[in-house]
């Protein structure tokens, strides 16, 4: 029997999903007993029903819903369990096809721990609107049921994993589809499909239900971002597997969590929301650190610790620091050879530099010490100099090589900092040569200077950086505190 005849057959004998409709408009798509209303493509035996669960275990196969299947605006809920290293997902606005990955519609990603195949490393995690609005943080563990909720109204898509919202995307008109992406990845209408990605990916599904919404339904307040060159590049980089994450976002100057998340979703940049911890900073002890981590519980963002000054390692315990997703610091606060503590961005603390070469040699020495001994994952504001100093002249090849070499040797990623446009191109090229990883970072003072990785994009294009050159927490040998936890108190 051909694929299309099978589709007609299954639709005819199993178009009974409507029988499960509840009074509030919800319709069960899975009866808990059979594959009625569904059609498996490519490798039919991959999909099975057992103990009330819809399961995939076998070679690649996509299971298409074939009931009353022309959905435009809708709300869908499902409960999902992913086994270790599972790559799966739910497609919407798609259509049945005989083989391959769906060429129409969008996918809500299910991937907690799948690493990828061959040299490819999948960065897009559960809750992503795949390759359009990506989630880079693992939000749920393997072997645990979680709820997926998808709400599509007009040009707006919203996604929740359990009670955590991961996506609020409003598609521009016309849709922006980057090169290499499926050409029919735009909001339209169609059916649903579940993904069996490969033989090693095993997932379970239950309680799959949907309710139609009016064709003219709209999401209150939804507005598409302005489509400019940066918008196009960010979507393209996300589709190409660059982890588009700004790890240096601060809740300052009136920027709060709702405001930050609205910007993140609109711009298509995932965030690491970081607090300043250390001597003279808003957080100076474990209690404050733990309170901050708890304040971001239920938010789809990395939780970052900006370690300020050189005293921080003795102020916080390993247990408290371990609650953060990553730690970053810079070489902007240090004590000179005469015992003078200074913050380089404050002219009154720096004062008049009598011997510039000695100042630079001390800075290099301090930076190498920070990178070599402190348990940090990212070197932020890299190679910063006080205002008025000639960066290109003073950061000689020899000095740069000492600092970059220390970062490479200690597995510390280097931030491409938007605020200060640092490091310079020479340092980026050297860091790439020495196989350092990179991150994006705004270092904002409020909502007004929260950026879109523009300087990082510039360095990608000038220096030929590729997606494997970029760091994400947990992808390259674990956290720094796991390697250098002994530097911390307790």
Language-model-detected regions and their locations in the chain:
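Charged catalytic cores and adjacent phosphate/nucleic-acid-binding surfaces used
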Residues: 226-241, 391-490
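N-terminal secretory signal peptides and thylakoid transit peptides that target proteins
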Residues: 1-16
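Structural recognition of the beta-strand scaffold that forms the well-ordered cores
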Residues: 107-110, 272-273, 415
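An N-terminally biased module of ancient metal coordination in phosphate/nucleic-acid-related enzymes
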Residues: 226-311, 378, 382, 386-398, ...
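Carbohydrate-interacting regions of secretory-pathway proteins
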Residues: 22-227
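Short, charged, surface-exposed secondary-structure boundary motifs
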Residues: 119-120, 282-283, 336-340, 448-452
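Extended substrate/RNA-proximal surfaces in nucleic-acid metabolism proteins
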Residues: 285-409, 461, 465, 485-489
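Flexible loop residues that form catalytic
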Residues: 95, 213, 332, 384-387, ...
């Amino acid at each position: 029997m051909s694929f299309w005849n099978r589709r007609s057959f299954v639709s005819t004998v199993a178009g009974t999903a409507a029988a499960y409709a509840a009074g509030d408009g919800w319709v069960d798509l899975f009866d808990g007993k059979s594959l009625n209303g569904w059609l498996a493509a490519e490798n039919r035996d991959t999909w099975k029903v057992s103990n009330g669960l819809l399961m995939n275990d076998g070679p690649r196969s996509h299971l298409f819903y074939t009931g009353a299947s022309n959905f435009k605006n809708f709300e869908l809920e499902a409960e999902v369990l992913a086994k270790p290293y599972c790559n799966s997902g739910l497609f919407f606005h798609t259509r049945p096809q005989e083989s391959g990955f769906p060429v129409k519609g969008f996918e809500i990603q299910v991937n907690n721990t799948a690493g990828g195949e061959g040299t490819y490393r999948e960065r897009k995690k559960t809750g992503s609107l795949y390759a359009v609005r990506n989630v880079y943080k693992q939000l749920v563990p393997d072997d645990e049921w979680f709820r997926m909720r998808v709400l599509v109204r007009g040009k707006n898509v919203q996604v929740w994993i359990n009670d955590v919202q991961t996506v609020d995307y409003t598609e521009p008109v016309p849709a922006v589809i980057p090169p290499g992406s499926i050409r029919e990845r735009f909001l339209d209408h169609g059916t649903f499909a579940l993904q069996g990605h490969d033989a090693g990916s095993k997932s379970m599904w239950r309680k799959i239900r949907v309710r139609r919404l009016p064709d003219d339904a709209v999401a209150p307040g939804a507005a598409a971002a302005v489509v400019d060159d940066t918008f196009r590049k960010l979507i393209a980089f996300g589709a190409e597997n660059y982890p588009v994450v700004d790890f240096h976002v601060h809740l300052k100057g009136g920027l709060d969590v709702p405001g930050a998340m609205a910007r993140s979703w609109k711009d298509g940049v995932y965030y690491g929301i970081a607090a300043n911890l250390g001597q003279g900073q808003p957080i100076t002890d474990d209690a404050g650190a733990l309170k901050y981590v708890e304040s971001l519980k239920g938010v789809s963002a990395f939780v970052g610790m900006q370690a300020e000054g050189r005293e921080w390692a003795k102020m916080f315990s390993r247990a408290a620091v371990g609650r953060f997703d990553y730690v970053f610091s810079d070489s902007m606060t240090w004590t000179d050879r005469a015992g003078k503590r200074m913050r380089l961005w404050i002219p009154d603390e720096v004062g008049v530099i009598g011997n510039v070469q000695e100042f630079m040699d001390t800075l290099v020495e301090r930076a190498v010490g920070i990178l070599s001994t402190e348990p940090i994952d990212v070197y932020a504001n890299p190679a910063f100099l006080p205002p008025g100093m000639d960066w290109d002249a003073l950061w000689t090849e020899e000095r740069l090589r000492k600092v970059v070499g220390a970062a490479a040797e200690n597995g510390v990623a280097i931030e491409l900092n938007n605020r200060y446009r640092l490091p310079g191109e020479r340092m980026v090229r050297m860091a790439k040569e020495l196989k350092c990883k990179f991150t994006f970072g705004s270092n904002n003072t409020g909502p007004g200077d929260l950026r879109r990785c523009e300087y990082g994009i510039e360095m990608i294009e000038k220096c030929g950086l590729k997606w494997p050159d970029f760091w994400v927490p947990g992808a390259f040998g674990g956290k720094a505190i796991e390697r250098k936890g002994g530097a911390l108190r307790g």
